[in-house]
Regions:
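Extended alpha-helical rod/solenoid/coiled-coil scaffold segments used as assembly/tethering elements
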Residues: 1-193
Length: 193
C-alpha cells in the first residue's frame, strides 16, 4: 500500500508541478496559444484525475474521524497517513490553481493591453473632429496593434481548444481588453468630439 500511495503522490505532484510551471512560464513569455492549451486543455484533465484520485484515496484510506462508527477504522501507518494527506493537499492545490488561472490570465491581458494603449493611443487633439475632414474608414493603428497583440493571440490559441473551453478565455480577455481601453481613456481624459 505504501508503494502505491508513493507512486500516486509522485505522479500527481509531478504533473501538477509541470502544469503550473508551464502555465506561469508561458504567461510570462506572453505565449498565449501555449498558455491556453495548458490551462484550458490539460488543466481540466489534471483536475478531473486528481479529484478522482482524491476520492479513491479517501474511500480506501478514510480519515479516522471520517470512518462511520459501525465500521472498524483502517489502521494506517504514519507514512501512509502522510502520503494520503499530501495527495489530498496536491489535489487541493490543483483546485485552487484551476480557479485562479483565468484571473491571473485576465490580469496579465489587462496589463499588456494597458501598456499598448499607453504607448500607442493618440491623445488630445487627434480626437477632435475639426482636425479631420472625414470619419475614419479603417481602424486606428493603435487599435489594430492592441487587438492583434492581445485578442489575436488569444483567438489563435482558442482555436486549438474544444468549443466549451473557448468561451471562458475569450470572455476574460475581451473584458480585460475593454477595461484597459476604458481605464486609459478615463486616465488620459480623452474626449471624443
Amino acid at each position: 500500500r505504501l508503494e502505491v500511495l508513493g507512486c500516486c503522490l509522485a505522479t500527481v505532484h509531478a504533473a501538477c508541478s509541470w502544469l503550473m510551471g508551464r502555465a506561469c512560464r508561458y504567461l510570462a513569455a506572453w505565449a498565449l496559444p501555449q498558455f491556453l492549451l495548458v490551462t484550458q486543455g490539460d488543466l481540466p484533465l489534471l483536475k478531473m484525475e486528481t479529484d478522482r484520485l482524491g476520492v479513491l484515496v479517501s474511500g480506501t484510506f478514510p480519515e479516522p474521524a471520517a470512518t462511520p462508527p459501525e465500521l472498524p477504522p483502517t489502521l494506517l501507518s504514519h507514512q501512509e497517513h502522510q502520503l494520503c494527506q499530501q495527495i489530498r493537499s496536491t489535489a487541493a492545490s490543483v483546485q485552487l490553481f484551476s480557479g485562479d488561472v483565468l484571473k491571473m490570465f485576465s490580469t496579465d491581458c489587462k496589463r499588456m493591453s494597458a501598456e499598448i494603449f499607453d504607448q500607442t493611443m493618440p491623445l488630445g487633439k487627434h480626437w477632435r473632429v475639426g482636425l479631420r475632414a472625414d470619419l475614419p474608414s479603417s481602424p486606428s493603428a493603435y487599435a489594430a496593434a492592441a487587438a492583434q497583440a492581445v485578442l489575436g493571440q488569444v483567438l489563435q490559441g482558442a482555436q486549438l481548444l474544444p468549443r466549451d473551453a473557448q468561451a471562458p478565455a475569450l470572455a476574460r480577455v475581451t473584458t480585460a481588453f475593454l477595461e484597459a481601453w476604458m481605464d486609459h481613456i478615463l486616465a488620459q481624459r480623452i474626449k471624443f468630439r
